[in-house]
C-alpha cells in the first residue's frame, strides 16, 4: 500500500478553512425570524464547534444546540450567554445565541497563523495534569504555571498514574516536585485505578470552574471518568513503543461534577505556547523571582551572566530552584525562536 503523502501546513490550513466555510454555510441556511423566537434567556456554553454551540439553559438545566448570531466569533466552553429558544427546532437546532456576557477570565492558546485563540472562559482554577507515563516534564509544568500566573488563574498540580510507582519511586517524584510546594503550589498525587487522591481532588474542584490541561496521554480523560462515573469519555491509549497518547479529546467541553464544581476538559497539547508574552512577563510569572525583582545591579538584567544579578545569586545560595531557573532560560530562548518562526510563517502566508 502506498504511503499517504503528508499535507503541508498551508494545505492543512486550507482544508480547515474549507471545513469552517461549509459549517458556516450550513448555519446560514437556518434563518430565525423574530416571530419564531421566544424571550431572552441566560445560558452556559458546554461546548462550541464551528457556527454551533451546545448551551445549558440556566433555569431548566437542559442542553440546547444553538446557532450563533453574526458577529459572535469568540465563544468557548465556560462562556455565559444570552440566548433565545425557537418555538420549534429547525434541522436539529433549538435556538440562537444573541450575546456573550463579560468574562472574568479567558484561557488563550497562541496560534501561529491566527494569533491568540480562546480555549475556555470564566476559569477559576487550572488543573495541570502530569503523569509518570508519558515521562514527567517539569519544563511543561513551568509553561502551564506561567500561563496560569499571567492570566490570574489559580493553578493546581496533579501527578496522575501513581499506581505505576513503587513506594521508593513515588518518594523520588515527591522530591522532584518539592520545589513547587516550597513556593506555594498545591500538589495532589492521584490514580484512577487505585482511587488514591480522588476524594482530595474532588474537594479541590468544588464551587469552581476548573480546566484540565496537560500533554496527551497523561490521563485527563481518565480522571474525568473517575470524577464523573456516568460519563464514558474515550481514554487515550498508551503506545508500548512510544509511551505517547494515541487519542486525545478533540474539543473543550464543560462537565458538572456530582460532588460539586464544574470541569472543562481541554484538547491535549504537546507544550503550551508562550511566544506572545514578553520576557518581563515570564520573569514576573515566576513566584520565587518576585522578591528579588528590581534589586539587580542593571535595570535590563537578563538574570543570566549579568554582573550583580541577585536572582542568579539566590540560585547559587539555594534560595531558588536551579531546575526552575534553568527552565526559565530555556523558555525565554524558545520564545525568541518561536517568534522568529511565526514571523517566517506570516511572511510565507502573505506569499500564498
From Swiss-Prot:
Places the protein is found: Cytoplasm
GO CC aspect terms: cytoplasm
GO molecular function, one term: GTP binding
Enzyme Commission number, as recorded: 3.6.1.-
Ranges for region Disordered: 1-24
Binding site for GTP: 160-163, 214-222
Tagged with keyword 4Fe-4S: no
Protein name: Small ribosomal subunit biogenesis GTPase RsgA 1
The organism of origin for this protein: Vibrio vulnificus (strain YJ016)
Gene transcribed to yield this protein: rsgA1
Amino acid at each position: 500500500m502506498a504511503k499517504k503523502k503528508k499535507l503541508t501546513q498551508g494545505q492543512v490550513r486550507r482544508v480547515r478553512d474549507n471545513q469552517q466555510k461549509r459549517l458556516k454555510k450550513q448555519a446560514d441556511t437556518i434563518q430565525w425570524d423574530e416571530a419564531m423566537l421566544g424571550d431572552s434567556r441566560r445560558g452556559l456554553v458546554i461546548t462550541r464547534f464551528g457556527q454551533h454551540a451546545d448551551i445549558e439553559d440556566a433555569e431548566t438545566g437542559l442542553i440546547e444546540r444553538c446557532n450563533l448570531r453574526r458577529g459572535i466569533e469568540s465563544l468557548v466552553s465556560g462562556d455565559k450567554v444570552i440566548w433565545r429558544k425557537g418555538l420549534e427546532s429547525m434541522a436539529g437546532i433549538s435556538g440562537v445565541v444573541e450575546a456573550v456576557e463579560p468574562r472574568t477570565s479567558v484561557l488563550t492558546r497562541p496560534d501561529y497563523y491566527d494569533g491568540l485563540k480562546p480555549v475556555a472562559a470564566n476559569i477559576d482554577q487550572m488543573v495541570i495534569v502530569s503523569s509518570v507515563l508519558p515521562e514527567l516534564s517539569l519544563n511543561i509544568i513551568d509553561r502551564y504555571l506561567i500561563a496560569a500566573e499571567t492570566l490570574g488563574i489559580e493553578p493546581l498540580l496533579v501527578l496522575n498514574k501513581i499506581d505505576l510507582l513503587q513506594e521508593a519511586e513515588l518518594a523520588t517524584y515527591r522530591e522532584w516536585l518539592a520545589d513547587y510546594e516550597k513556593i506555594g503550589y498545591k500538589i495532589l498525587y492521584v490514580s484512577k485505578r487505585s482511587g488514591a487522591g480522588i476524594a482530595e481532588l474532588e474537594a479541590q474542584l468544588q464551587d469552581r470552574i476548573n480546566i484540565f490541561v496537560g500533554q496527551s496521554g497523561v490521563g485527563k480523560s481518565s480522571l474525568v471518568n473517575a470524577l464523573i462515573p456516568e460519563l464514558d469519555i474515550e481514554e487515550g491509549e498508551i503506545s508500548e513503543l512510544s509511551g505517547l497518547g494515541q487519542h486525545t479529546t478533540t474539543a473543550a467541553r464543560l462537565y458538572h461534577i456530582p460532588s460539586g464544581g464544574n470541569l472543562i476538559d481541554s484538547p491535549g497539547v504537546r507544550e503550551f505556547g508562550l511566544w506572545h508574552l514578553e520576557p518581563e512577563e515570564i520573569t514576573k510569572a515566576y513566584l520565587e523571582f518576585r522578591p528579588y525583582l528590581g534589586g539587580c545591579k542593571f535595570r535590563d538584567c537578563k538574570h543570566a551572566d549579568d554582573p550583580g544579578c541577585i536572582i542568579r545569586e539566590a540560585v547559587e545560595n539555594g534560595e531558588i530552584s536551579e531546575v526552575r531557573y534553568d527552565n526559565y532560560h530555556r523558555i525565554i530562548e524558545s520564545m525568541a525562536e518561536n517568534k522568529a518562526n511565526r514571523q517566517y510563517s506570516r511572511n510565507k502566508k502573505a506569499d500564498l
